[in-house]
Amino acid sequence: MLNLFRNRKRNGAGPTIKKAQKMPELDDFLSNQDYEGAISLLNHKLKAGNLDREEEDSLQLWLAHCYYRLRNYEEAANVYTFLMNKDDAPAELGVYLACCKFYLKQYIEAKSIAEKCPKTPLCIRLMMNVSLRLNDEKRILTFHSSLGDTLEDRLSLAGVNYSRMHYQDAIEVYTSVLQTSPNLIGLNVNMALCYAKMDYPHVAYNLIKNYLRNFPNSPFAKNLLLSVLYRTITSKTTVDEKSELARNIDQEGLTMVSDMEALLKQKLYPEIEYICKHNLVLFKNCETALQVLPSLMKHIPEARVNLILYHLNKNNVKDAISLCKDFDPVTPYEFLVKALTFLRHGQETNSREHLKIAENFFQMVGESGLVQDTIAGRQSSAAYLFLSFKFDDVITYLKSIEAYFTNNDDFLLNLAQAYLMYKNYVAAEKLFIRVSGPERDKILYKSMLARCYVRNKKPQSAWDMMLKTNNPSDRMSLLKVIAQDCYIANEFYYASKAFHEIEISDPTTENWSGKRGACAGLFRQLANHKTDPILISQMREVVHLVAMKPHSNCEFLLKVVRNWAETHNVNIIN
């Protein structure tokens, strides 16, 4: 009977009593990073009362801390101010309040408060960052020299280096910290940011991937990964085929938009949400640029930059230059965008002033120690030198980065133009022919290639390209290039044909003079090579063209040519 009773209890027969759940304490909320829950608990305890001064102050401090961690710096500042107004308030509260003012971008106020506080390590780090925001270089160096060798001081220094665009210095600090504290995996993201800024996308990609293996749900890391993918795809630079980035870029590139849309469905801090919205516009080829980017400009500097680029890509140079009026560049990339805008505006309006400003901006970026030896830095130097007509130096700079742009049409065109202006027509022609995209259909491309053909003694190729051009305006432009360049290059047969076609559409004295001069030039060549069958055939055709469209002076020219042909027994009569 006793055994049966025991079995019934073991089998769960009979009533069971639920164990009462333990109410969460402050430590539970803090350990789970549930700061909203912690704030609710703290406010409840504060309203309940029955607290002595020490207990109340402790709860208020935790309340301020939770507001701070939620980035609600205004509320945190209010709590710290309330505590500071009490008798015998701890002096370090001023530093905490100054930190709130710093994140509220109230730098002057943060400086004023911090200067009255004890010079603790936290205060020194804060003052160094405040000085950075106020562009006070002297004070930055002063507080830098006061830093110790603690982890916090080293990481603060790395952050300042990053903000000053001293990316390599920041990387060295992060690398040193990781050697002694490999558990600080988050520093991989900081280093990835540095490498991304330095145009080493494959290194940045590997570092972010390493972090995401441990924290796959990090919104910031996911956004950074997608940004690196986007930048790599759109820059069209060559990526090391053996790298993890090269192996994954095609597949991951296909899901960039859906990945970013999924990320935006998460609960994000406002700053991260702004960045993600901005990047989603880029991933969608700026389809919603005009609707989204203007509202983001006050939150994200890149929004203005990309809106300027959007207008430039749409050939809305007037709108782009308008956005530059209130735009004070800080980073080399921002200076590049402003330089490009001034360049385009200067070219469209023939404004030497804007072209000179663009030249100065390009030179400034190219000579900057921050990007001097990067791809962007060398491209900037090349642009400056091109505007300065130093084409041999342009070629030197562009050749130094050619390996990164093996199939990039924009790069090929820039290098080809430099060779063309340097009068190395053979090298220019080879590069122009390698262009494979829509630029081949533009009149500027065809005009430059035609010039190369003519100077490389291939006028027939230039003529054939003109015949395949359907747009009447482009066709006429090509005829003018062929006529003038063939005349200069002593290719008088094609010069005559081109001037003849131009004269049909525009029968001016100038065009007739060009045709007459080309005919006379071909006649002189024939006179020196009387038995050349090609020249005889060409002269026969040109005489026919001159006779087709009579002019007041053409009879004399034809008479001279025919008399010479008859005297020398050369048949130029059809």
Curated annotation (Swiss-Prot):
TPR repeat windows: 20-52, 57-90, 151-184
Assembly with partners or alone: Component of the IFT complex B composed of at least che-2, che-13, dyf-1, dyf-3, dyf-6, dyf-11, dyf-13, ift-20, ift-74, ift-81, ifta-2, osm-1, osm-5 and osm-6.
InterPro entries: TPR-like_helical_dom_sf (IPR011990), TTC26 (IPR030511)
Biological process terms in GO annotation: cilium assembly; intraciliary anterograde transport; intraciliary transport; intraciliary transport involved in cilium assembly; protein transport
Any GO CC annotation of this UniProt entry: ciliary basal body
UniProt GO MF annotations: intraciliary transport particle B binding
Keyword Protein transport: yes
Role description: Component of the intraflagellar transport (IFT) complex B required for transport of proteins in the motile cilium. May be required for ciliary entrance and transport of specific ciliary cargo proteins such as che-3 which are related to motility.
Protein name, entry field: Intraflagellar transport protein 56 homolog
Phenotype caused by lack of the gene: Structural cilia defect: cilia are short and lack distal portions.
Localization per Swiss-Prot or TrEMBL: Cell projection, Cilium
Natural source organism: Caenorhabditis elegans
